[in-house]
């Protein structure tokens, strides 16, 4: 059982603060945590080995070290039922008798559509474990991948060792054995739909290029191939462009992963390097399969409920806060960029005791900057949601797959007299109240056949995730792998976009790495500079000041 001091160290690492600065009764959000980005997920991921089930919404609103520790303590005293990783099912919402009886059975559907998909994939029936529909998000990325408009996601590691080729092959074999996403194929059905197929074994491709940069460039334009593994590996030995260093790359299509998957993959590899035999044991059950998650969401009609909610949410919204609607562009290029480091809020509370959470500050600052650019006082933009707020699907925080979704975020700036602390609290309430509707496609995010306009900017918040260390603790030259360090700084990723602006923000302790990418035909360079400068000024004002909304609006 983890001690309170150990819990403080985990919180300190996730939040980027010293453990002795954390009080037992201080709230996670007030300390700088968030429920939109990944800090809360990282924290719950760190304690996942204790098998504790905690509702994310409750935790981010009221969670303290004391309450989390008590929940973990309580879990240890109960008999926690373990299930096969391919069939994790509902937890907090409960299972009915039929669901419970069939929860641990892996089934193959026998419809004509699925038979066709298996035939096209040239799969041996005995190798097929399960077939499931794809999610709307998977469908979106699949369409882009098949058209060559989006490439692979690359997870890059710098590696050293006496036998990297065989050592890494062993690592990937273990990784595939416990993580179903690595053994998931996508194939077409008779009605021109698609299904995902979980297989017992797969043969992912290995590449041995001499130049890391050229390999990454190739993956960025690589098309999705139906019926083929969506994962491939590369080992680059003694890359001349990087002072002779060695690199290992896991490349995955976006149909199978998201930003949080990088953290999860790092955690899995850390466990493998620490003890391969312990990781391989049968008691270390498979992680949940994304296909079963899709079935669960469909069974609960989550997508349908979300669509109804977002339809009502967007009623009356004016989305033209960057350019006139008639100038909308499909699959445009981000040919402009402003990249800068901005000091993040250091003090989580100011003189009046009001919290200053970085997520609240960023979203409020972006809304105000767009209001100043457009003259509108009802602002809507797209916001990346991590997709793992609900605890209705067991062990969702260890689930690899494209759960991240883009949803509308709407901020009213009508009242000039509203104090900044009240605005920030309203932002937090909006985050919390809409978390339950984070699944399914909402209107006004992507171009649609009904001709509705879509949001003109997207905000993507990323936290610094500590997924793994430097590899094995033993520093022996005789180890097959003696060093393995994540190198996300080497990754480049490009995609076509119909949004005029992509605001990507990565928080490293007390600094924001802000990257604002924009399409010059939709946002002129001069206006882009003004928008960014206004956003930066609003961050500073909201972080420390007592301004009213009217004082921040030009």
Curated annotation (Swiss-Prot):
Database matches in InterPro entries: ACP-like_sf, CAT-like_dom_sf, Condensatn, PP-bd_ACP
Keyword list, A-Z: Ligase, Phosphopantetheine, Phosphoprotein
GO CC, any one term: cytoplasm
Region spans: Condensation: 124-434
PTM sites of type O-(pantetheine 4'-phosphoryl)serine: 35
Entry EC number(s): 6.3.2.-
Pathway in which this enzyme or protein is active: Mycotoxin biosynthesis
Top-level taxon of origin: Eukaryota
Record note on domains: ALT12 encodes a nonribosomal peptide synthetase containing two domains, a peptidyl carrier protein domain and a condensation domain.
PANTHER family listed in its UniProt record: NONRIBOSOMAL PEPTIDE SYNTHETASE, NONRIBOSOMAL PEPTIDE SYNTHETASE 5
UniProt protein name: Nonribosomal peptide synthetase ALT12
Species whose genome carries this gene: Alternaria alternata
């Amino acid at each position: 059982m983890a001690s309170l001091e150990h819990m403080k160290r985990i919180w300190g690492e996730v939040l980027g603060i010293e453990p002795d600065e954390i009080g037992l009764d201080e709230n996670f959000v007030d300390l700088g945590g968030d429920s939109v980005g990944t800090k809360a997920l990282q924290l719950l991921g760190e304690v996942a080995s204790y098998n504790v089930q905690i509702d994310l919404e409750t935790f981010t609103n009221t969670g303290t070290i004391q309450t989390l520790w008590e929940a973990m303590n309580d879990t240890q005293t109960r008999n926690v039922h373990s299930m096969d990783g391919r069939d994790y099912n509902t937890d907090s919402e409960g299972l009915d008798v039929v669901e419970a009886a069939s929860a641990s059975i892996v089934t193959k559907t026998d419809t004509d559509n699925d038979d066709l998909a298996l035939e096209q994939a040239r799969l041996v029936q005995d190798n097929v474990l399960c077939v499931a529909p794809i999610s709307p998000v998977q469908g979106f990325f699949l369409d882009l991948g098949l058209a060559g408009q989006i490439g692979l996601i690359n997870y890059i590691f710098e590696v050293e060792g006496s036998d990297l080729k065989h050592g890494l092959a062993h690592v990937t074999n273990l990784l595939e054995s416990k993580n179903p996403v690595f053994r998931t194929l996508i194939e077409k059905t008779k009605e021109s739909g698609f299904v995902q197929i979980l297989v017992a074994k797969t043969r992912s491709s290995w590449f041995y290029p001499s130049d890391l940069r050229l390999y990454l460039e190739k993956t960025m334009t690589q098309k999705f191939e139906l019926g083929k593994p969506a994962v491939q590996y590369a080992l680059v030995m003694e890359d001349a462009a990087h002072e002779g260093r060695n690199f290992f790359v896991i490349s995955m299509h976006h149909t199978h992963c998201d930003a949080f998957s990088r953290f999860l993959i790092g955690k899995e590899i850390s466990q493998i390097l620490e003890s391969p035999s312990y990781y391989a044991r049968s008691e270390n059950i498979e992680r949940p399969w994304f296909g079963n998650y899709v079935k669960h969401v469909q069974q609960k009609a989550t997508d349908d409920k979300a669509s109804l909610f977002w339809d009502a949410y967007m009623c009356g919204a004016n989305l033209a806060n960057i350019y006139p609607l008639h100038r909308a562009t499909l699959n445009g290029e981000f040919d402009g960029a402003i990249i800068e480091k901005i000091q993040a809020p250091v003090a989580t509370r100011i003189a009046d005791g009001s919290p200053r959470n970085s997520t609240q500050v960023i979203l409020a600052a972006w809304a105000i900057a767009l209001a100043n650019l457009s003259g509108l006082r009802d602002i809507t933009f797209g916001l990346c949601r991590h997709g793992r707020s609900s605890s209705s699907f067991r062990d969702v925080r260890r689930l690899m797959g494209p759960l991240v979704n883009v949803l509308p975020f709407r901020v009213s700036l009508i009242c000039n007299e509203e104090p900044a602390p009240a605005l920030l609290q309203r932002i937090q309430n909006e985050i919390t109240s809409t978390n339950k509707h984070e699944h399914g496609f909402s209107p006004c995010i992507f171009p649609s056949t009904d001709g509705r306009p879509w949001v003109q900017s997207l905000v993507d918040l990323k936290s610094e995730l500590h997924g793994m260390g430097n590899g094995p603790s033993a520093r022996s030259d005789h180890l097959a792998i003696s060093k393995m360090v994540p190198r996300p700084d080497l990754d480049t990723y490009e995609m076509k976009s119909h949004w005029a602006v992509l605001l990507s923000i990565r928080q490293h302790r007390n600094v924001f790495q802000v990257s604002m990418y924009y399409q010059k035909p939709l946002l002129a360079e001069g206006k882009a500079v003004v928008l960014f400068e206004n956003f930066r000024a609003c961050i500073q004002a909201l972080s420390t000041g007592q301004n009213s909304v009217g004082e921040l609006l030009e």
